[in-house]
A protein has these predicted regions:
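Thiamine diphosphate
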Residues: 1-124, 131, ...
């Protein structure tokens, strides 16, 4: 489901599939981090809820360097309501030591992966189901400054703050306002 088959084939000795045991996945990643590794743990956003206790006590309170990739964040209509990842931002924001990120495109996803791994603390990267928007990716991802938004377009009347795939929608709205009303709208990628 998470599309990691190619990664499993490329590095089978570094790939662990725990099945539908999200608590175990988080605890395994915590154990690896305690042992000096920098694990990346891929879980559907909605099913990360099952591992809330180990996320708090075994990863975040210990400030362990685990990077979580939360697939199907937001609405996931083709999978049905049980797979909508709607609550992760609200329940992760109240946990100390973690970073929550959501890329606007696949290039920024690479930057966020680098940021998560290099930050040496719990990092949560959420993204929707499906393919990216088709932007060209850098050969060498660049770590992002944590907590700093990206101003994509400057205006004077108002601003639209967006995150993830909604950044493209915000840019489209800003373009429509410019075309129809001659109004420049600021668009900010909250990241």
């Amino acid at each position: 489901g998470t599309g990691l088959d190619a990664l499993h084939k490329a590095i089978p000795e570094r790939f662990f599939d725990v099945g539908i045991a999200e608590e175990h996945a988080v605890l395994l990643a915590a154990g690896m981090a305690t042992g000096g590794k920098l694990p990346v743990c891929a879980i559907y956003s909605t099913f990360l809820q099952r591992a809330y206790d180990p996320i708090i006590h075994d990863v975040c309170l210990q400030n362990l360097p685990v990077t979580f990739c939360l697939d199907r964040a937001g609405l996931s209509p083709n999978d049905g309501p049980t797979h909508h990842g709607l609550f992760d931002i609200s329940y992760l924001r109240c946990i100390p030591n973690g970073i929550i990120m959501q890329p606007k495109d696949e290039d920024e996803l690479q930057d966020m992966m680098t940021t998560g791994i290099e930050s040496k603390c719990p990092a949560f990267i959420r993204y929707p189901r499906g393919e990216g928007v088709g932007v060209e990716r850098k050969k060498n991802p660049i770590p992002l400054e944590v907590g700093k938004a990206e101003v994509l377009r400057k205006g004077s009347l108002c601003a639209i703050w967006a995150i993830g795939d909604f950044v493209q929608i915000a840019l489209s709205i800003a373009n429509q306002f410019k075309k129809k009303y001659g109004i420049e709208i600021t668009v900010v990628n909250a990241r």
